[in-house]
Curated annotation (Swiss-Prot):
It is found in: Cell membrane. It is a single-pass type II membrane protein. Its EC number is 2.7.8.-. It comes from Bacillus mycoides (strain KBAB4) (Bacillus weihenstephanensis). The chain crosses the membrane at residues 5-25. This is Polyisoprenyl-teichoic acid--peptidoglycan teichoic acid transferase TagU. Belongs to the LytR/CpsA/Psr (LCP) family. Residues 1-4 are cytoplasmic. HAMAP family: TagU_transferase. It holds the Pfam family LytR_cpsA_psr. Disulfide bonds: none annotated.
Length: 304
């Protein structure tokens, strides 16, 4: 769902500042404040003195964990969705891997195995990053976290979105007919969370998440939504976190955006069933996981 959110944010920035004059200055000032607010470094990003350590060089391949946090009220919740993307600006290509939330794996820092989405509940984004790195055997350079409960604010801020729905269903009091439908923030949240009535299960849910995000990107980057740019920035500020700095965001917008033109989506094969404890898990064969690891490491140009 979220693989383009960074480029969407920066695309809006680029459109809004071309007006020039005082308006452009005010917009840039608001954007700068928003990017400062969403910047949340990982614990490992700081040295013993609390100073952020250097990141990778410009124009080198990078990996990003896109994490949808299922936070409701005071409940920290679990990661509602996990997606890893790798970007290689040398050949302008991108690979994306959506990790099923029920995937059974070692939870780094807990000394046990569990569903991969439980890592967020146990140790927040730091433990999620470490667990995904262990699971895929690839380094994660950056993360972008979106509060899924507050994602509806972003949808409403751009005036709702239009998507093409391929499965008629009802969820959380909202009915979704087949065909083109317009979604408010609340409807978009229900639309992207449903999976039990979908024969494709979590994979169908992931597809709807991508649909909504792509619609948000298209709507948010259009001139018709500029009048509400303040609402958009407020929604981002409240619901997005990342360890990317402002400079890194602008560098990424400049050097990595063309990677979107050549995208490959990699699915994780496996088998879902109940374990002896009666809990449903998604099991990924070692050979299948190694194949994905090899693809990602090659794309990141990692030789060791």
């Amino acid at each position: 769902m979220k693989k383009k959110i960074l480029f969407w944010i920066l695309g809006i920035i680029g459109i809004m500042i071309i007006g020039g004059g005082v308006y452009a200055y005010n917009v840039y000032s608001s954007v700068s404040k928003t990017l400062d607010e969403v910047h949340k470094p990982l614990k490992r990003d700081k040295d013993s003195n609390g100073v952020e350590t250097a990141k990778i060089s410009k124009s080198e391949p990078v990996s990003i964990l896109l994490l949808g946090a299922d936070e409701r009220g005071e409940d920290k919740g679990r990661s509602d969705s996990l997606m890893v993307i790798t970007l290689n600006p040398k050949n302008n290509s991108m690979k994306t891997v959506s990790i099923p939330r029920d995937t059974y794996t070692e939870i780094v820092g807990k000394g046990k195995s569990d569903k991969i989405n439980h890592a967020y509940a146990f140790g927040g984004v730091d433990m999620s990053v470490a667990t995904v790195e262990k699971f895929l055997s690839v380094p994660i350079n950056y993360y972008i976290e979106v509060n899924m409960e507050g994602f509806k604010d972003i949808v409403d801020a751009v005036g709702g979105v239009d998507v093409n729905n391929d499965l008629e269903f009802t969820a959380n009091g909202h009915h979704f007919a087949k065909g083109n439908v317009h979604l408010t923030g609340d409807q978009a949240l229900a639309f992207t969370r449903m999976r039990k009535e979908d024969p494709r299960g979590d994979f169908g849910r992931q597809m709807r998440q991508r649909q909504v995000m792509q619609a948000v990107i298209k709507k948010g980057a259009s001139f018709s939504s500029l009048s509400s740019y303040g609402d958009v920035l407020t929604a981002i500020q409240k619901n997005v976190k990342t360890n990317l700095t402002q400079d890194q965001m602008f560098d990424m917008q400049k050097n990595y955006k063309n990677c979107l033109q050549n995208s490959e989506e990699i699915q994780i094969p496996g088998d879902g069933h109940k374990a002896a404890d009666g809990i449903w898990y998604y099991y990924v064969p070692d050979a299948a996981k190694q194949d994905i690891t090899n693809k990602l490491r090659a794309h990141l140009e990692l030789t060791k």
